[in-house]
């Protein structure tokens, strides 16, 4: 959705309705990162949740020539495909955490793994504060057992972490998918976190199209 917003809003400020209330910080981060990557979105409002937008009228009533857009499931599938640049099921690595993975996202990853192990490199980019909490909760042990490599205070797009001279990288980050090919030499494939996990277990690209209907 963030990638779609960036392509359609450009430099404009958007007011968004229809999100769950409250929207999680992780969803806000993903939305903002995707919109800023594919467009130049520096500000958006979520009506009823962000401070300046208690109602739609509060921010739109006196603004002329507003435009209303309603993305469909087909729009989001097309955006997913726009962020995916591989025509085969071959896969070399998984990379998540742009913006950096939070503690709740890491717990969701462990839940999705269900004690299974990735057979390809699986990078999780996060920060030192999340790492400290994972260490305290003794969660690095199951992560390492699952083949997860923790990348701290940087990301695979700007640090020489990825192995080889290219390949296919799957991610649940619109930001990674957008910038990754130009910055890493890896072809990107976009999917959900569960898609990334199932693909990591099999070593082949797997996507659940039911999520996009």
Which functions belong to the PLM regions below?
Residues 21-22, 49-52, 100-101, 128-130, ...:
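Short, glycine-/Ser/Thr-/acidic-enriched flexible segments
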């Amino acid at each position: 959705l963030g990638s779609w917003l960036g392509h359609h809003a450009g430099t404009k400020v958007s007011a968004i309705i229809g999100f769950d209330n409250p929207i999680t910080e992780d969803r806000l981060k993903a939305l903002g990162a995707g919109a800023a990557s594919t467009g130049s979105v520096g500000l958006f409002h979520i009506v009823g949740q962000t401070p300046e937008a208690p109602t739609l009228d509060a921010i739109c009533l006196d603004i002329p020539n507003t435009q209303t857009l309603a993305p469909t499931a087909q729009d989001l599938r097309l955006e997913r495909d726009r962020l995916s640049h591989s025509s085969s099921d071959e896969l070399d690595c998984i990379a998540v955490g742009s913006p950096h993975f939070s503690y709740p996202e890491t717990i969701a990853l462990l839940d999705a793994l269900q004690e299974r192990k990735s057979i390809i490199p699986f990078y999780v980019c996060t920060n030192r504060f999340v790492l400290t909490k994972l260490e305290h909760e003794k969660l690095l042990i199951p992560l390492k057992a699952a083949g997860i490599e923790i990348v701290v205070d940087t990301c695979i797009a700007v640090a020489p972490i990825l192995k080889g001279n290219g390949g296919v990288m799957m991610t649940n980050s619109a930001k990674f998918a957008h910038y990754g090919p130009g910055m890493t030499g890896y072809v990107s494939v976009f999917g959900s976190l569960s898609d990334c996990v199932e693909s990591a277990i099999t070593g082949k690209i797997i996507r659940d199209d039911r999520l996009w209907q």
